[in-house]
């Protein structure tokens, strides 16, 4: 069976997007692994399957698959690419600029600009330690963590996945490859943690590198950018709208404060289209 696909990327985070709204396709884990293989398949960080919505409140659904064939919950860069894909393929009614996309965890609101960036409602940050999860006696803006013989100060935030955020003087010389994995697997983070290294340039501009749990440093991490801005706001360093420069490019994050949702704006671009045989 031949399946049409679109290769897309957001800040260097690349995806193979498949239309399962208009073509019947349910790839198996083995087929997902083949699609994602950079030597023998198309190659990507994740495979996205656009599907009909199951809930009446949603316009479309989508499924996310990792290169090993397992299913993921949500991806900020991925949902931006999915929304751009749906619009480019003519699946979004003319004049519509806001969509509700169903994930396995809930609903995600997306705003489209004509041939430009995509804005995603990333939900409200979770700050209570048991729900991050993070072992601490009570919620605080900043925590101390003993790691590798030193005490580091960090913020702890969940954006649907856990994040630790450290402030550094210079992200270029930050110990991402050593301190990242040490914090990632620290016993106070029972489900491990993504680790962000944030350099504050101004109250509206930061640089960020993220060591992702189970993956190492990546070019871009949408939830990591959201967590960094939330933590920076709580610690009094940042304003409501912040430009976040990652190795793969720039995201713009808006967070008005406690109880409010985080909004992320960034690029979503088509690289090429093609067909792949799935046997």
UniProtKB/Swiss-Prot annotation:
Its EC number is 5.1.1.7. Pfam families: DAP_epimerase (PF01678). Transmembrane segments: none annotated. It is found in: Cytoplasm. The keyword Isomerase applies. One of its GO terms (biological process) is lysine biosynthetic process via diaminopimelate. The record marks 272 as: Important for dimerization. The active site is at residues 75, 221. GO terms for cellular component: cytosol. It is an enzyme of class 5 (isomerase). It catalyses: (2S,6S)-2,6-diaminopimelate = meso-2,6-diaminopimelate. Keywords: Amino-acid biosynthesis, Cytoplasm, Isomerase, Lysine biosynthesis. GO terms for molecular function: diaminopimelate epimerase activity. The record marks 163, 212 as: Could be important to modulate the pK values of the two catalytic cysteine residues. Pathway: Amino-acid biosynthesis; L-lysine biosynthesis via DAP pathway; DL-2,6-diaminopimelate from LL-2,6-diaminopimelate: step 1/1. Substrate binds at residues 13, 46, 66, 76-77, 161, 194, 212-213, 222-223. Homodimer. NCBIfam families: DapF. Catalyzes the stereoinversion of LL-2,6-diaminopimelate (L,L-DAP) to meso-diaminopimelate (meso-DAP), a precursor of L-lysine and an essential component of the bacterial peptidoglycan. HAMAP family: DAP_epimerase. Belongs to the diaminopimelate epimerase family. This is Diaminopimelate epimerase. It comes from Alkalilimnicola ehrlichii (strain ATCC BAA-1101 / DSM 17681 / MLHE-1).
């Amino acid at each position: 069976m031949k399946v049409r696909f679109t290769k897309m990327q957001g800040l260097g985070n690349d995806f193979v997007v498949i239309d399962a709204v208009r073509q019947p396709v349910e790839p198996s884990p083995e087929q997902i692994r083949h699609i994602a293989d950079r030597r023998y398949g198309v190659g990507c960080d994740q495979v996205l399957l656009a599907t009909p919505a199951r809930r009446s409140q949603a316009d479309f659904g989508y499924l996310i698959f990792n290169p090993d064939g397992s299913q993921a919950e949500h991806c900020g860069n991925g949902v931006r690419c999915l929304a751009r894909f749906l619009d480019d393929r003519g699946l979004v009614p003319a004049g519509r600029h806001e969509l509700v996309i169903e994930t396995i965890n809930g609903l995600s609101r997306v705003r489209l600009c004509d041939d430009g960036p995509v804005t995603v409602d990333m939900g409200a940050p979770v700050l209570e330690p048991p729900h991050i999860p993070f072992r601490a006696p009570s919620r605080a803006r900043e925590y101390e963590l003993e790691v590798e013989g030193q005490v580091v100060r960090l913020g702890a935030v969940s954006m649907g996945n856990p994040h630790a955020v450290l402030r550094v003087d210079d992200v270029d010389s930050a110990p991402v490859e050593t301190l990242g994995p040490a914090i990632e697997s620290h016993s106070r983070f029972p489900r491990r943690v993504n680790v962000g290294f944030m350099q504050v340039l101004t109250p509206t501009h930061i640089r960020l590198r993220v060591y992702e749990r189970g993956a190492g440093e990546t070019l871009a991490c949408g939830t990591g950018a959201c967590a960094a801005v939330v933590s920076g706001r709580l610690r009094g360093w940042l304003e409501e709208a912040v430009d976040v420069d990652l190795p793969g490019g720039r995201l713009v994050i808006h967070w008005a404060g406690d109880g409010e949702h985080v909004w992320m704006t960034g690029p979503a671009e088509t690289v090429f289209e093609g067909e792949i045989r799935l046997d």
